[in-house]
């Protein structure tokens, strides 16, 4: 039989030996149209397949072939009139989560077809596209397809979309799935949708895709070829995987040593997983320094030029071994041939959002078990393999089952803008694998409104322009905002330093600017990114000519020193221009991260700490040249689990004037009350968000200000510790204890004086007392007796507050008149003395207000003849008697006097009469007169 002339059909006729081949007939049947070929309804299908089974290699050609036959027997899809000018039939878009995976998949498939990329198979990633009118399979990143979908919700000219590696749960991937299913339901029921996943809950995915056609989508499962995989545990000993500043260098030394060990113990190529590009480059440098004979050590991460990425994916010459040190880009969506050994650091870097501070960044965490299984599986694709895990079995057992989907943990500002452009700002009605968290989405929408990209009516004209630019929301807006000042080219060059995925040495963007401008590492990627952004800026200028409102305050015009952005002509960048420009762009992109150093510059090799406008603490890497700068425009941070501050990864120095201008929305002046050593004073404060710029003494606090401040302090510190700051003297303690006793035994209307109740009712009892104190110096707000000598600012002192008098405001009327009757301050004893009742005996500051036994401490001689124990609170509570020696030391404790005289007193008399012979110790205390003095011995 003659080989088909169509290279795609030829590939399917003689496919490579891959597990997915077993299900190709079933896939063809489920994806083929009805016999009539004109029902106009595309198929929806979910395919699950382990990594390495060939789904990315053979499913797109199969679908392209099926669609070619469908368009040959029925109307051409993707166009309302059945026509699709300028292309061949059967156009398939395949999404990949990463640029490197999209390029690699396109190159591999084109090689199988015997073609160059750009023919039947093409790709499109940020800044690069190789595809033409005849391209039938185009492999793109999710972000590329998302922008196409927003421009054309009908996706005219596209017959099918394959969402690959859905299990990775990227934010753009989840958003794209939701919008595609919405578009298919409303506009393109003929669009074929296929979701391919390795580990995801397939039933849930089937329900979501099936929701576009009223039922669950079919599921096709590809069996994997399982080769034996051995596990070796390689914990780092005393060195932890994570420290307070991220991944310790000692742990990277351990990973490199584990790679050396694995090379010595096993044959074949080795793939090592590290959490990020910094760690990859560190371990690569260590391994290359070891200079093992016949071994090529290659890095693999998204920051590398495409040529270096290709080298890592290309087998080494015969007789040489490869060690590929990679981030998670090689976890599932890339094939690294020849690998028989995997060394897994068991760490991953994931995006996180702190909603309370609206601080987003990357966090290094322990890898999930699902991701760890994916990593290990790379060693068993071609034969028996082994995985070395750099953790203990106990740590592995504690690992989460699956990684957290980005939509549940990342900054949703970009997603919120996409939803606003789509017309559903809250995402309601869309089919989500996981709905966006309400708090994070609300914070994102608030950020969009602050940036002028959205309002209560939805997306603004400026927001629509920003959404169409190939950059993050904040960076795209900064490009448009700074172009009038810098010129389009200079603004694009500065913005490219933030978007080109380059590493700033010591977190210093100005050092990076000098590095790339002089042709150093990263210069090629920077120039490519800058050209791309400049062209985007020019297109935005053209849009402005058609709709000036669309540019808002960012209307592009000739900028100082920047030339005409519309023509792209500008003056060559002068020395220092790029450094100044990147500070302006970074501060415009992230004004809430503008920061001022805390204290003086640190000693050499130490970390410098900064306070940001948003209130989050920031720190520079130790030894960073930026530590001399008081003000910084921060563009990127890493978050460390368990730490409240964030590590600055990209920043540029600012002067104070520019900082105040860029973050002007946070500039405010206020008069506030502050505490100073237990005293209250006022000051006039000028601040930039959470950064205090200046504070000058203000007038004495007025009565209401003082009351509000005291009440706020009590509540802010918690009921127990807050009340402890008040000046509780013995009278106040006693009154509170008396009221607590009444509330416990008689209930309402006697007040609850527990910590929580007093804090809750502070406006009723505490505030009036504070206002009275604050107003006693003549009604001007001055405070008699609370002026510090030599101070120009009179201050309110809590020490002058009469807490007992304040508590009396809680006494109920008319019951207050019976207070001393129910819980008397003093009780008359037989000697005629009025002895104080101790209602707080044994209580410390933390126990004020807790009910306990009232105590009457009195000398034995004053109680002779007293047979009945006194009782209070309408007879409900017996007073506990502490009977004292002449030296006022307790000799007995009782609440039953009759029993004491009969049983306890004889022993006390025997012990005391010799020690205190001048005092009365009668044999018959019942009939002996009580006395305050010594009396006569009997």
Report residues per predicted region.
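P-loop NTPase motor module signature
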Residues: 1-474, 478, 551-557, 561-570, ...
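Generic recognition of stable, solvent-exposed alpha-helical segments in well-folded globular domains
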Residues: 22, 26, 54, 58, ...
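Extended active-site and interfacial segments that coordinate phosphate-rich ligands
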Residues: 152-167, 174-177, 345-349, 358, ...
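Charge-dense polyanion-binding interfaces
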Residues: 162-163, 295-297, 303-305, 309, ...
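Acidic, serine/threonine- and proline-rich low-complexity intrinsically disordered segments
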Residues: 454, 489-609, 614-617, 630-826, ...
């Amino acid at each position: 039989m003659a080989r088909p002339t169509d290279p795609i059909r030829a590939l399917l006729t003689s496919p490579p030996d891959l597990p997915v081949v077993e299900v190709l007939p079933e896939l063809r049947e489920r994806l083929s149209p009805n016999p009539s070929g004109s029902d106009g309804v595309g198929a929806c299908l979910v395919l699950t397949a382990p990594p390495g089974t060939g789904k990315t290699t053979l499913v797109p050609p199969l679908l392209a072939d099926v669609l070619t036959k469908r368009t040959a027997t029925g109307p051409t899809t993707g166009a309302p009139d059945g026509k699709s000018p300028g292309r061949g039939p059967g156009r398939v878009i395949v999404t990949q989560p990463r640029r490197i995976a999209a390029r690699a998949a396109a190159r591999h498939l084109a090689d199988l077809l015997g073609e160059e990329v750009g023919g039947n198979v093409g790709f499109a990633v940020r800044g690069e596209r190789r595809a033409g009118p005849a391209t039938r399979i185009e492999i793109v990143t999710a972000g590329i397809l998302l922008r196409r979908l927003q421009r054309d919700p009908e996706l005219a000219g596209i017959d099918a979309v394959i969402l690959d590696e859905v299990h990775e749960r990227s934010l753009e991937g989840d958003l794209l799935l939701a919008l595609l299913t919405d578009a298919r339901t409303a506009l393109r029921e003929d669009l074929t949708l296929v979701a391919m996943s390795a580990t995801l809950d397939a039933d849930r995915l089937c329900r979501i895709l099936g929701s576009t056609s009223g039922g669950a989508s079919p599921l096709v499962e590809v069996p994997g070829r399982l080769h034996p995989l051995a596990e070796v545990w390689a914990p780092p000993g005393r060195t932890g995987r994570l420290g307070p500043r991220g991944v310790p260098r000692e742990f990277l030394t351990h990973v490199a040593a584990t790679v050396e060990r694995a090379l010595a113990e096993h044959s074949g190529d080795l793939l090592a997983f590290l959490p990020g590009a910094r760690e990859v480059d560190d371990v690569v440098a260590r391994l290359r320094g070891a200079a093992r004979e016949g071994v090529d050590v290659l890095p693999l991460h998204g920051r590398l030029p495409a040529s270096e990425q290709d080298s890592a994916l290309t087998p080494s010459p015969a007789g040489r071994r490869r060690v590929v040190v990679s981030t998670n880009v090689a976890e599932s969506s890339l094939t690294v041939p020849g690998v028989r050994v995997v060394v897994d650091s068991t760490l991953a870097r994931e995006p996180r959002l702190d909603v309370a501070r609206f601080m987003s960044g990357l966090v290094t965490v322990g890898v999930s078990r699902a991701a760890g299984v994916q990593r290990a599986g790379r060693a068993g694709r071609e034969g028996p393999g082994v995985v070395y895990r750099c953790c203990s079995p106990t740590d592995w057992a504690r690992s989460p089952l699956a990684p957290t989907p980005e939509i549940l943990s990342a900054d949703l500002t970009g997603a919120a803008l996409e939803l606003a452009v789509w017309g559903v700002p809250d995402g309601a009605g869309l089919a989500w694998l996981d709905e966006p968290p309400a708090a994070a989405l609300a914070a994102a929408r608030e950020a969009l409104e602050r940036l002028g990209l959205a309002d209560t009516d939805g997306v603004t004209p400026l927001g629509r322009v920003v959404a169409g630019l190939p950059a993050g929301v904040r960076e795209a807006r900064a490009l448009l905002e700074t172009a009038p000042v810098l010129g389009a080219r200079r603004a694009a060059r500065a913005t490219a330093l933030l978007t080109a995925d380059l590493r700033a040495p010591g977190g210093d963007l100005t050092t990076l600017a000098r590095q790339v401008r002089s042709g150093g590492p990263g210069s090629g990627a920077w120039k490519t990114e800058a050209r791309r952004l400049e062209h985007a800026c020019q297109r935005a200028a053209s849009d402005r000519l058609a709709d000036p409102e669309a540019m808002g305050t960012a209307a592009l015009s000739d900028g100082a020193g920047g030339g005409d952005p519309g023509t792209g002509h500008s003056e060559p960048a002068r020395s220092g221009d790029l450094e100044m420009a990147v500070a302006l762009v970074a501060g415009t992109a992230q004004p809430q991260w503008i920061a001022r150093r805390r204290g003086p510059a640190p000693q050499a090799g130490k970390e410098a700490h900064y306070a940001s406008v948003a209130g989050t603490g920031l720190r520079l890497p130790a030894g960073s040249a930026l530590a001399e700068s008081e003000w910084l425009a921060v563009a990127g941070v890493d978050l460390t689990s368990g730490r409240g501050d964030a590590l600055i990864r990209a920043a540029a120095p600012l002067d104070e004037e520019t900082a105040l201008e860029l973050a002007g929305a946070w500039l405010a002046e206020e008069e506030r009350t502050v505490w100073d050593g237990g005293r209250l004073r006022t000051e006039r404060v000028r601040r930039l968000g959470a950064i205090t710029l200046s504070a000058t003494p203000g007038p004495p606090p007025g009565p209401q200000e003082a009351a509000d401040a005291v009440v706020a302090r009590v509540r802010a510190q918690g009921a127990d510790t807050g009340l402890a700051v008040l000046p509780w003297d013995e009278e106040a303690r006693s009154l509170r204890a008396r009221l607590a006793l009444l509330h416990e035994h008689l209930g309402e209307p006697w007040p609850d004086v527990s910590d929580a109740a007093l804090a809750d009712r502070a406006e009723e009892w505490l505030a009036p007392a504070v206002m009275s104190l604050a107003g006693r110096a003549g009604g001007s707000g001055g405070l008699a007796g609370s002026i510090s000598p030599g101070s120009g600012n009179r201050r309110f002192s809590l020490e002058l507050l009469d807490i007992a008098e304040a508590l009396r405001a809680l006494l109920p009327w008319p019951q207050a008149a019976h207070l001393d009757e129910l819980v008397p301050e003093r009780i008359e004893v037989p000697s005629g003395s009025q002895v104080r009742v101790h209602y707080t005996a044994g209580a410390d500051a933390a126990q004020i207000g807790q009910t306990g036994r009232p105590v009457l401490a009195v000398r034995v001689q004053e109680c002779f003849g007293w047979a009945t124990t006194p009782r209070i609170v309408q007879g409900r509570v017996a007073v506990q008697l502490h009977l004292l020696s002449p030296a006022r030391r307790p000799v007995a404790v009782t609440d039953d006097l009759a029993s004491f005289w009969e049983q306890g007193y004889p022993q006390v008399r025997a012990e005391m009469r010799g020690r205190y012979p001048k005092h009365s110790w009668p044999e018959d205390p019942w009939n002996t007169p009580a006395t305050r003095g010594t009396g006569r011995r009997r």
